[in-house]
Swiss-Prot record:
Present with 5130 molecules/cell in log phase SD medium. Residues 1-43 are annotated as: Disordered. Belongs to the NC2 alpha/DRAP1 family. InterPro entries: CBFA_NFYB_domain, Histone-fold, Transcr_DNA_Rep_Reg. GO terms for molecular function: chromatin binding; core promoter sequence-specific DNA binding; protein heterodimerization activity; RNA polymerase II general transcription initiation factor activity; transcription coactivator activity; transcription corepressor activity. Residues 29-137 form the Histone-fold domain. This is Negative cofactor 2 complex subunit alpha. It is found in: Nucleus. Transmembrane segments: none annotated. Residues 1-11 have a biased composition (Polar residues).
Length: 142
């Protein structure tokens, strides 16, 4: 019993897309890492992040859903890191859109245009404010 290795709760860092391991053929494993230039830029942005989402708060938010029972220790950490990657990508794409319009600021309108123009963010479209003159689909009540 004295030869047991202590169990640590610290997880290894999650590798961003630009650090995906290569298979024997020299291509990225899986379908990630298709555009290495954009991934390197996103990795640079992500490397500068000094703050992280607190896993305890992420866990509390996850457990507000009735369908979620027990949550392992790694799950909130991974969810927080995924959220950081997502936000970094949204800010990067919005910054490109702002530069394309000749401005240095990311406004709500630029965020909205980014979400509407990029298919990666199509799941956010239902949460956008609806323009005047457009009708928002009514939710069905059960």
């Amino acid at each position: 019993m004295a030869d047991q290795v202590p169990v640590t709760t610290q997880l290894p860092p999650i590798k961003p897309e630009h650090e995906v391991p290569l298979d024997a053929g020299g291509s990225p494993v899986g379908n990630m890492g298709t555009n290495s230039n954009n991934n390197n830029e996103l990795g640079d942005v992500f490397d500068r992040i000094k703050t992280h989402f607190p896993p305890a708060k992420v866990k509390k938010i996850m457990q507000t859903d009735e369908d979620i029972g027990k949550v392992s220790q790694a799950t909130p950490v991974i969810a927080g890191r995924s959220l950081e990657f997502f936000i970094a990508l949204l800010v990067k794409k919005s910054g490109e859109m702002a530069r394309g319009q000749g401005t240095k600021r990311i406004t709500a309108e630029i965020l909205k245009k980014t979400i509407l123009n990029d298919e990666k963010f199509d799941f956010l479209r239902e949460g956008l404010c609806v323009e005047e003159g457009q009708t928002q689909p009514e939710e069905e009540s059960a």
